[in-house]
Amino acid sequence: YFSDTLQLISDLPGEFLKKPVGKLGSIYCSKWHYNDRAAIFGDAAHTIVPFFGQGMNASLQDCTVMYSFVKKYDGNWDKIFTKFSEKQVPNGHAIADMALENYIEMRDSVNDPKYKIKRELEFDLENKFWDRFVPRYSMVSFHELPYSEVYRRGEVQSKLMYSFIGGDLTKKKLYEQIESNLTPIR
């Protein structure tokens, strides 16, 4: 709470109500190039809601991947752009999905007792399987994994946790599933 702020805004309700409401959304493109003529990347290819904080990182990742294909395919723009789209479109879709899911989680789940149980279990599993069971946010922020791989691993981890919480898996089976379904990343 910043009590001195009210003194700086003479008509807070009026100012608030006359400001336009912005819209947020994600754009999903099926490919990010047109033949050997042009490619899009960054926000032009994957406009996403800002709830994972990865817009700039995703754009820089696009530049890095494009550069690797420019070096590899030496002027063959059709191949460069095709390979770029094949690799990056799934990553763009994955980070867009994760950002939206993160918003929904922040909006709806934080007060849900089941969610709190899941978060506690997630911390416990991360401590026990520190090289395999890594939360999505940590995978995105501290590892160089493609977003599509982060998304896939996050889905596996979530499914395992909910199966355990729901009583479908014993602790022993949960541990076995983690060992067999999640390769080390650290």
Language-model features and meaning:
Residues Q7, S68-R186:
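C-terminal helical "tail/cap" subdomain of flavin- and related membrane-associated enzymes
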Residues Y1-D78:
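FAD/FMN-dependent oxidoreductases across multiple families
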